[in-house]
Amino acid sequence: MDEREALIKAGEIARQVKKEVVDLIKPGAKLYDIAEFVERRIVELGGKPAFPCNLSINEIAAHYTPYKGDGTVLKEGDYLKLDIGVHVDGYIADTAVTFRVGMEEDELMEAAREALENAIATVRAGVMIRDVARAIEETIRGKGFNPIVNLSGHKVERYKLHAGVSVPNVYREADTYVLQEGDVFAIEPFATTGAGQVIEVPPALIFMYLRDRPVRMLQARRLLMHIKKNYKTLPFAYRWLQDFLPEGQLKLALAQLEKAGAIYAYPILREVRGGMVAQFEHTVIVEKEGAYITT
């Protein structure tokens, strides 16, 4: 399977899981059950999770994934952002959709969805990133909402979810990267009723391996080896490690590894004013005359 075939296969799996999960999104549903279903189906369909299933509600914009024992349930009217990642041999599909639990799509969701459509319509080889960002910003502001300025889409490479080039939600003169044929990008507009900025809040429930570092605690060394072997350079969930070590030891080991610079912790991201947040996302392959949507 070549790179393009793997990217397309990952996208097909992500699309299928998005379809299947709809039936679970209802008042009273547990986030834990939804995340476990999503990740299990990814594997059953022939892929692997490229990152933990993100389930972020209302003013939480990103990086919430449930843990074992998490009792969080969906309530009618919640804005649920479902962000899923699939990889096939390291080639990634990253896609997100917002649900209004028990209700129809509203104007906030429409703004984010249309921003994604308009952004993708600008994508082709030779276009600057800032022109894609402009389409996102103009669409969201035109609908009376704010784009989130400190969240962005990103270039994707094999086993690298964030490959060094961002696709912001707002136009910036300095974003002069020119899209190349064959580039893979995840484009993800975030629209909010709030101020248009996110802040980090504890706890971190998602982590990523950075590098080997000496640590004193034996369990921390064992944990780092386990992380490297199983997740390579892709993000992983606290939940995925809860059976590996007892709770107290796991928290201590993760804290040591983070302090040593061996792993990176992704804090939960919340809209600064508590505004509602909607997000839609596709992964695209840049082509001469447009974009091939894999998801």
Curated annotation (Swiss-Prot):
EC number in record: 3.4.11.18
Binding site for a divalent metal cation 2: 94, 154, 188, 281
GO cellular component: cytoplasm
Chain sites annotated for binding a divalent metal cation 1: 83, 94, 281
InterPro entries: Creatinase/aminopeptidase-like, Met_Aminopeptidase_Type2, MetAP_archaeal, Pept_M24, Pept_M24_MAP, Pept_M24A_MAP2, Pept_M24A_MAP2_BS, WH-like_DNA-bd_sf
Residues given in the record as substrate binding sites: 63, 162
Cofactor annotation: Co(2+); Zn(2+); Mn(2+); Fe(2+)
The record's free-text note on cofactor binding: Binds 2 divalent metal cations per subunit. Has a high-affinity and a low affinity metal-binding site. The true nature of the physiological cofactor is under debate. The enzyme is active with cobalt, zinc, manganese or divalent iron ions. Most likely, methionine aminopeptidases function as mononuclear Fe(2+)-metalloproteases under physiological conditions, and the catalytically relevant metal-binding site has been assigned to the histidine-containing high-affinity site.
UniProt keyword NAD present: no
GO biological process: proteolysis
Similarity annotation: Belongs to the peptidase M24A family. Methionine aminopeptidase archaeal type 2 subfamily.
Name of this chain's protein: Methionine aminopeptidase
Species for this entry: Thermococcus kodakarensis (strain ATCC BAA-918 / JCM 12380 / KOD1)
